[in-house]
Amino acid sequence: MQPLSQIRREYSQGHLTEASLLADPYAQFDKWMADAVEAGLPDPTAMTVATVNSQGQPSQRIVLLKDVMDGCFVFYTNLGSRKAQDLLTNSKISLHFPWHILERQVLVRGSASLLPRQDVQHYFSSRPLSSQLAAWTSKQSQPIESRDALLSRFEDTKIKFSDKDIPAPEFWGGFKIIPQEIEFWQGGEHRLHDRFLFSRENSSNWSIQRLMP
């Protein structure tokens, strides 16, 4: 393998310009997400979610974006997970969408709050049966002795709910992220990337700045 310091490539798929940038960051995000889906990217809704605990220790993990509604980015998770526990003590959050094939990325910085239970139940009911059962099976981030033990818990859960509707567990919920900043990055030749930062001024207005790469 060649040295890691020598692994690089040029970015040459295009430019993001003042003329092509949409004035609404949500519309720009929707356009880029549609481009990612159209390009056949695997897991185009996958995003890195960064949180910080009460001791100031950051953590990251990949989570799937499930909606953008009412100006908020939405995802769901076990409320006992590290990310949920972090957010319940420190609501600051960062999302990162890495669309490598398109030489694009989007950064979202803001604050998270819990979704209402009726929204959680509505989404939970739309999930595949196996995903509903898995949510009840897993005490996310807790130790377990083996995969066989996990599968045994899953089978027990299937029996428990074999003849009834499956409600959303109380320990499972969703978060909505209200962004304060949304940054769009397009790779450029000679590492002269295009970066535009939307910063929230109030509930409906954003300032826009081009940033140096």
Curated annotation (Swiss-Prot):
Stretches that traverse the bilayer: none
Keyword Lipid biosynthesis recorded: no
One of the record's GO molecular function terms: FMN binding
Enzyme Commission number(s) from the entry: 1.4.3.5
Cofactor binding description: Binds 1 FMN per subunit.
Pathway stated in the Swiss-Prot or TrEMBL entry: Cofactor metabolism; pyridoxal 5'-phosphate salvage; pyridoxal 5'-phosphate from pyridoxamine 5'-phosphate: step 1/1; Cofactor metabolism; pyridoxal 5'-phosphate salvage; pyridoxal 5'-phosphate from pyridoxine 5'-phosphate: step 1/1
GO biological process, one term: pyridoxine biosynthetic process
NCBIfam families linked: pdxH, PRK05679.1
Protein name: Pyridoxine/pyridoxamine 5'-phosphate oxidase
Organism name: Pseudoalteromonas atlantica (strain T6c / ATCC BAA-1087)
Encoding gene, per UniProt annotation: pdxH
